Amino acid sequence: MAKRKIVKKKVVRKSIAKGIVYISATFNNTMVTVTDEMGNAIAWSSAGGLGFKGSKKSTPYAAQQAVEDALNKAKEHGIKEVGIKVQGPGSGRETAVKSVGAVEGIKVTFLKDITPLAHNGCRPPKRRRV
């Protein structure tokens, strides 16, 4: 009996000019996702995924590194213009937004805060006592 040949499909990368950078800055981590205009993910990165552990994940420097990593991956797909959507109260939020504008060859078109605000919904967690 003859053996079957395994045929590998070639990976076709689409050239995408415009995209959206979603920055989710929580108290413990910062996640960055680059999508096309339809919302399909192109590249992503997070502070924890880059090797920052524990309390170092929530630092502004870790957020900056996560943004640079995600945008460098997205540049391979031909991204030239991005809009920024920021969510969450984290400490890396401002630094992440600034570092998107600092990346070479990428133009920022808009900046929007999409943090969900409760209209007297769920009761918030109790205050910490240290």
From Swiss-Prot:
Signal peptide: none annotated. GO terms for cellular component: ribonucleoprotein complex; ribosome. It holds the Pfam family Ribosomal_S11. The keyword Ribosomal protein applies. Part of the 30S ribosomal subunit. Interacts with proteins S7 and S18. Binds to IF-3. Belongs to the universal ribosomal protein uS11 family. Located on the platform of the 30S subunit, it bridges several disparate RNA helices of the 16S rRNA. Forms part of the Shine-Dalgarno cleft in the 70S ribosome. This is Small ribosomal subunit protein uS11. It comes from Campylobacter curvus (strain 525.92). The gene is rpsK.
